Curated annotation (Swiss-Prot):
The keyword Manganese applies. This is 1-deoxy-D-xylulose 5-phosphate reductoisomerase. GO terms for biological process: isopentenyl diphosphate biosynthetic process, methylerythritol 4-phosphate pathway involved in terpenoid biosynthetic process. Belongs to the DXR family. InterPro entries: DXP_reductoisomerase, DXP_reductoisomerase_C, DXP_reductoisomerase_N, DXPR_C, DXPR_C_sf, NAD(P)-bd_dom_sf.
Length: 401
């Protein structure tokens, strides 16, 4: 039976890759709803090609522009806007599958709505689990939702684990691989001078600006450790990170008997997306077959926590529990936004996050309101910390120590 998709974040890199796979298999997939924040022109192009019933944007002005262009083109897609509209298309009876690809905390509410509606969820928005892990996983279990990871690392782990949960007891640990980003071998003393353009040039993957910066600081890998904790019900001590510059092995599972299973493939997000879309079937993703002879060699190294303090901060937040991970994520979003707008330097990102974690009290996350309050408090604290920095010193590491 054809799957009906709501694609949250359709104009981003994950959205592009998802629609590429969907277009290859029109007999399997159709689009119920697409969403974008403010990239109305690209959303119009997608609507004209895939003819969704609903398109969601971030604000009324963008909605009016998109609706006018669609009417002019004779497209009948309904255009709505705002956070509630995202929730509506995520829990609608018009779809059975929700691809959650909105970057950041903005993706939490619609992803949670999809879980509570019992949808099949393809999760690319790691923040939903980072912020509200127990709450989100409870919603999935209590409402019969199906959760399939789209992040390449978590999708790799999913493929390497036994299908039956009862057999997961044989798992010794999971190993998330990381490319090390664009600054893996750069002299640490020069990192204070990194520009947004340099940070956004990932050596292997095509990604959006925010996640590219997170990869450069390795905060992205830290968030993935937290996500893996909730997805696979393993403590942080049994989740390792391994630098693998070629990005060919996407992650590994180590078993009690000494076996290690790994998932390999070319670094292209269409592979995990196609796997999750068609699961348990396999379909063509458009990705070239892996040629190991051409690659010739694969290398590995341990992460340098001095070079990548954000990775250590994420591990610390996971160990502390409560709302610490939500605060970590919120502070990082504010810090990365400030870096991209050239308000602070690259090395200041970790310092801002560290300052927020050390300032805000941690507490239990019993309900979504607890998470949202921690998120808001961390954003305020991060913004206030950045604002207190002298203008001439914001781009130095020393200014935020």
């Amino acid at each position: 039976m054809q799957k009906r998709l709501t694609l949250l974040g359709s104009t981003g890199s994950i959205g592009d890759s998802t629609l590429d796979v969907v277009a290859r298999h029109p007999e399997r997939f159709s689009v119920y709803a697409l969403s974008a924040h403010r990239n109305g022109d690209k959303l119009v192009e997608q609507c004209l090609r895939f003819e969704p019933e609903v398109a969601v944007v971030g604000d009324a002005d963008t909605a009016a522009r998109v609706a006018a262009k669609l009417r002019e083109a004779g497209c009948k897609t309904e255009v709505t806007y705002g956070p509630q509209a995202l929730v509506d298309v995520s829990e609608s009876d018009g779809c059975d599958t929700v691809v959650a690809a909105i970057v950041g905390a903005a993706g939490l509410a619609p992803s949670l709505a999809a879980a509570r509606a019992g949808k099949r969820i393809l999760l690319a928005n790691k923040e939903a689990l980072v912020m509200s892990g127990a709450i989100f996983m409870d919603a999935v279990r209590d409402n019969g939702a199906v959760l399939l990871p789209v992040d390449s690392e978590h999708n790799a782990i999913f493929q390497c684990l036994p299908r039956e949960a009862a057999l997961h007891g044989g798992v010794s640990k999971i190993i998330l691989t990381a490319s090390g980003g664009p600054f893996r071998t750069r002299e640490p003393a020069t990192l204070v001078d990194v520009t947004p353009e340099e940070a956004c040039k990932h050596p292997n993957w095509v990604m959006g600006r925010k996640i590219s910066v997170d990869s450069a600081t390795m905060m992205n890998k830290g968030l993935e450790v937290i996500e893996a904790h909730w997805l696979f019900d393993l403590p942080g001590e049994r989740i390792d990170v391994l630098i693998h510059p070629q990005s060919v092995i996407h992650s590994l599972v180590s078993y009690a008997d000494g076996s290690v299973l790994a998932q390999l493939g070319n670094p292209d997000m269409r592979t995990p997306i196609a796997h999750a879309l068609a699961f348990p079937d396999r379909v063509d993703s458009g990705v070239a077959q892996l040629d190991l002879a051409q690659i010739a060699s694969l290398s590995f190294e341990k992460p340098d926590y001095a070079r990548f303090p954000c990775l250590a901060l994420a591990m610390k937040a996971l160990a502390e529990g409560g709302v610490a991970s939500a605060a970590l994520n919120a502070a990082n979003e504010i810090a990365v936004e400030a870096f991209l707008s050239r308000q602070i330097g690259f090395m200041a990102i970790a310092q801002v996050v560290d300052a927020v974690l050390n300032t805000l009290p941690n507490r239990s996350a019993h309900a979504l309101e607890d998470v949202l309050e921690a998120d808001a408090a961390a954003r305020r604290a991060a913004a206030e910390f950045i604002a207190r920095l002298p203008d001439g010193a914001r781009r130095t590491e020393r200014a935020v120590q």
